[in-house]
Amino acid sequence: MRVDKFLNAVCITKRRAIAEDMCRSGVVSINDNVVKASKEVRVGDTISIKFTTHTDSYKVLAVPTSKNVPKNAQSEFVEKL
């Protein structure tokens, strides 16, 4: 699954367009490598998002098969580090 779709599916971003913009701006990285929106996410990857005041990191536990995941099921797919 593409990183922009993944961020939207597991409710890290509200819209896929926001995730695409974040990737285009260079604030999203997987395993310490800045990535484009089309980068594939795999189980075990660490996704980091840089904000102006802090950085959020998430470990991918599973890749969802559906387009959207309920917010209460987010912990099945990502673990906040």
Where are these predicted regions, by residue range?
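A basic, amphipathic helix-loop patch mediating RNA/tRNA/ribosome contacts
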Residues: M1-E40
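Short, charged beta-turn/beta-strand-edge "cap" motif at the junction between a beta-strand
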Residues: V34, T52-D56
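A generic structural micro-feature
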Residues: E40-V41, T52
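C-terminal structural segments of small proteins and small subunits
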Residues: T55-L81
